[in-house]
């Protein structure tokens, strides 16, 4: 064993010596590096400093267009950071110098123009660094590389980049945004001036200006104003409203053809599909949120809603106040629902597009036959049936949620409506009306239709409060 180790040592020593010689191939390198003997960097050095061929002393690097390479002696110029030494003696200007004895010029590895923080466009990053170094030597602020491409111009996209390949959400938004509208409702105050009292969203379904939105967005029958993505505004007329389905159709008279959105088939949706919600929450136009389909068509049986017209798509895409009426779309840009309500963070609902399709067909038939609907009663509230499962989930998300497992859970109270005037608030749970126990949202709807006045008992926190609400008659 000792003999084997001795033989191995004898073989390796020359190899290690060779490695040292290869590292110190440059003529003139000292045996040991003493940095105290290194010459100072010239003050006019603009390409930055690098270590010399001996990996010992910092020296001024050759800049773009300056000579490089040489005979392999200490002191031969070497290119600075971001540059490479290229020769042009018959082997091409971009061939990197790899052989001793060759000389060339330093060229920038990148030929892409760039923009500096001084607002100037540079041929490449190397030129920017050279100008920045000069500025610092003159006690001026450095120039920062802030953008690929010339100043004032967008960077040319690389089709192979991850951003280009996987930005499918942005592609969807770019496709659908022109057909999404912002809706504002106005009423006159005591001084006979119009003031905005509510807002929402909608989307164009016909080139001549038909727009779909939620019924609760426009049900107050105030003056309705629609603003397009271009900023142009129009007064809208309410063409049809289905309070039960919470869908409305309004129309604007625009002088040009409008971009439209097509309906997809919500019946084909699968849990886990990506969806995009777009609208105007808090009057912030074209606000985009994304998520997945949590459950397809969660409705009557699971939410305790006896009315089969109130089926929902559940999604974790955020839907806020003002986002209502905007489209929920799939990755093909097809509308698969109307953004309708948010129960709590991560639990939002949309009316399925198949329901929208049915509403549009019925609306067309009604208008074709000249049918008019009777007036409907309205209190201005959105609610859903409180089930034990939903109550448990809400208690986990809201510490102050009342200790109740049935009733009608109030999701939103629309401003300037009988519900608000009567004192009803968001997150209240309606537990009885006119002495009758309330176990579902449908019970409340029935009471609104049949009773002139509602004496409602609501659970707010851990307190029962009695409210009086007078339903208002509205045109459909």
From Swiss-Prot:
GO terms for biological process: positive regulation of apoptotic process; programmed cell death; proteolysis. Residues 1-19 form the signal peptide. Keywords: Cytoplasm, Disulfide bond, Growth factor binding, Hydrolase, Protease, Secreted, Serine protease, Signal. Disulfide bonds join 29-54, 33-56, 38-57, 45-60, 68-85, 79-106. Pfam families: IGFBP, Kazal_2, PDZ_6, Trypsin_2. Its EC number is 3.4.21.-. PROSITE patterns: IGFBP_N_2 (PS51323), KAZAL_2 (PS51465), PDZ (PS50106). It is an enzyme of class 3 (hydrolase). The keyword Transmembrane does not apply. Residues 94-153 form the Kazal-like domain. Residues 25-109 form the IGFBP N-terminal domain. The active site is at 216 (charge relay system), 246 (charge relay system), 324 (charge relay system). Belongs to the peptidase S1C family. PANTHER family: SERINE PROTEASE FAMILY S1C HTRA-RELATED, SERINE PROTEASE HTRA1. This is Serine protease HTRA1B.
